[in-house]
Each structure stands twice: as structure tokens, then as C-alpha cells.
Amino acid sequence: MSETTLNDIPQLRRGFRFQWEPAQNCHVLLYPEGMVKLNDSAAAILGQVDGDRSIAAIVAALRERFPESDGIEEDVLEFLEVARERSWIELH
């Protein structure tokens, strides 16, 4: 498996849906076998994943939204690599 890069374009895998879940009071990733509760950082990243934007564009959007945060690029790359390993997303 190749390394995740800023040029990759992530998208949720078929059957997965990202949404706010009032009963859980957090964003979740729903899929046929269950649900993953997401922390705020994971939700901010997955909220940018639309199948059209590159990881570089996602990083830029998050830097604009959270200018005080350091290490956004590394955090995004690390999280999306984990998401890919868990088969939540595909990279193109």
C-alpha cells in the first residue's frame, strides 16, 4: 500500500455516511455493520472529505478554520492514513 500524499483525493467508501448524531452528541461515521463515534478533530477532517478535494485543499481549509493550530498537515495525513487502513475511505 502506498503512502498517503497531499495530492491524493479522499472519499468515503460506498456504504459509509458521515453525520451529526444527536443521540451521541457527536459526529459519527455510519456503515452497514455499525457506527464509529468521532472526536472533534476527526469530524473536522472527515467533514472536508467530499471526493473532489485533495488532501492539500483539505489541509488549507482546516488551516483557515483553525489558524492557531500547529501540525495540521501531519495530523490530517496521519488520520486519513488510519481511516484508509480501517477501510473508511478510498484515495484517488
Swiss-Prot record:
Which terms does the UniProt entry file under GO BP?
pyrroloquinoline quinone biosynthetic process
Please give the InterPro entries that the UniProt record associates with this protein. PQQD, PqqD_bac, PqqD_sf
Does the keyword field hold Magnesium? no
Name of a matching Pfam family: PqqD
In its UniProt record, a GO molecular function of this protein is: quinone binding
Any idea which UniProt keywords this protein has? PQQ biosynthesis
| Annotated pathway | Cofactor biosynthesis; pyrroloquinoline quinone biosynthesis
Q: Which NCBIfam families does the entry mention? A: PQQ_PqqD, PRK02079.1
* Self-association state and partner proteins as the record states: Monomer. Interacts with PqqE.
Q: Which family does it belong to?
A: Belongs to the PqqD family.
Name the job this protein performs. Answer: Functions as a PqqA binding protein and presents PqqA to PqqE, in the pyrroloquinoline quinone (PQQ) biosynthetic pathway.
Protein name, entry field: PqqA binding protein
Organism (species): Azotobacter vinelandii (strain DJ / ATCC BAA-1303)
